[in-house]
Amino acid sequence: MTDSGSFERILNDLRLAGDTAGGVVEIRAQGVAAGTGEPFFDSIESTAAHLIFSIPGVKGIEFGAGFAAARSRGSHNNDLIADRHGTTATNNDGGINGGLANGNEIVLRVGFKPAPSIAQPQETFDFTAGHPTPLVIPGRHDVCIALRGAVAAEAALAIALADLVLRAGNAAV
């Protein structure tokens, strides 16, 4: 969604309804040296995902074209090298090949679920009483945790990249 006015209206409508929404945030990292990462267990993807999935509410992550690449063909998805500097015409791999940075911008998207604590009555099960019962959660509620989660996910990616650089013995972060 690019229209900030529409976005604000949607958030306000959710707030008035006492409901929440999930969201997808895109994170980018520029200037990551080609070769940063490891080809197997400590790939950029696995290291970043390990930290990002530790953020409450995260339900998914995709790098580059992500799930759209799964519906594509290699002839359309391959990032063809255009010059001797390794520049590619596209960035479907999100700046990562085989777990290593390829010199392109690293691009990933993180999906957050809607916050479950909403300002509407919900049905739950009372295990003590042995029957369904209404649940009301008083207090302040985030309408969209992705708004706060974006900052946490960006920090997690930065930590993951710094960790990979430092473990490789290259302190030029």
Enumerate the language-model features and the residues they cover:
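A translation/RNA-centric and nucleic-acid-associated enzymatic feature enriched
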Residues: 58-135
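Flexible, glycine/charged-enriched surface loops at secondary-structure junctions
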Residues: 14-25, 57-69, 168-173
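Glycine-rich, charged/polar anion/phosphate-binding loops
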Residues: 7-16, 35, 45-48, 66, ...
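Internal helix-turn-beta structural module
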Residues: 107, 115-173
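Glycine-rich, mobile lid/loop segments that gate access to catalytic sites or pores
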Residues: 1-40
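Conserved phosphate/anionic-ligand binding catalytic regions in large, soluble enzymes, centered on
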Residues: 41-45, 53-56, 91-106, 147-164
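Small-residue-enriched transmembrane helix-hairpin modules in multi-pass membrane proteins
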Residues: 33-51, 56, 62-65, 69-71
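Solvent-exposed alpha-helices and their adjacent loops that cap or buttress functional pockets
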Residues: 17-21, 53-54, 81, 88-89, ...
